[in-house]
């Protein structure tokens, strides 16, 4: 025969159970980290846009050169 003990729930006071609101002063480097991440993302966006524009331009020039050489060979 088993004897079962009722589970005792630990009662915590409401003051310790309640969380205090988030304050930026608690994490001073969080804002700096966020702004530096934003700068890195902006730099990457500008760099990649210039890189992709240049890449597309060089691909277009290669296609034009190929078409003109094929056109010269066929005539």
UniProtKB/Swiss-Prot annotation:
Keywords: Cytolysis, Host cell inner membrane, Host cell lysis by virus, Host cell membrane, Host cell outer membrane, Host membrane, Membrane, Transmembrane, Transmembrane helix, Viral release from host cell. Residues 1-16 have a biased composition (Polar residues). It is found in: Host cell inner membrane; Host cell outer membrane. It comes from the Viruses. Residues 1-29 are annotated as: Disordered. The chain crosses the membrane at residues 38-60. GO terms for biological process: killing of cells of another organism. It is a single-pass membrane protein. One of its GO terms (cellular component) is host cell plasma membrane. Its main location: host cell. Induction: Lysis protein synthesis only occurs when the overlapping capsid gene is translated. Initiation at the lysis gene is prevented by a hairpin structure that sequesters the ribosomal binding site. The ribosome, terminating at the capsid reading frame, covers part of the lysis hairpin, thereby destabilizing the secondary structure and allowing the reading of the lysis gene. Belongs to the Leviviricetes lysis protein family. Induces the formation of specific membrane adhesion sites between the inner and outer membranes, apparently leading to host cell lysis. Lysis may be performed via activation of host murein hydrolases. This is Lysis protein. It comes from Escherichia phage MS2. The lineage of its organism: Viruses, Riboviria, Orthornavirae, Lenarviricota, Leviviricetes.
């Amino acid at each position: 025969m088993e004897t079962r003990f009722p589970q005792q729930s630990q009662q915590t006071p409401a003051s310790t159970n309640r969380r205090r609101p988030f304050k930026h002063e608690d994490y001073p480097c969080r804002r700096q980290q966020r702004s530096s991440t934003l700068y890195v993302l902006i730099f990457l966006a500008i760099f990649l846009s210039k890189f992709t524009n240049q890449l597309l331009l060089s691909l277009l020039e290669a296609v034009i050169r190929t078409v003109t050489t094929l056109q010269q060979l066929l005539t």
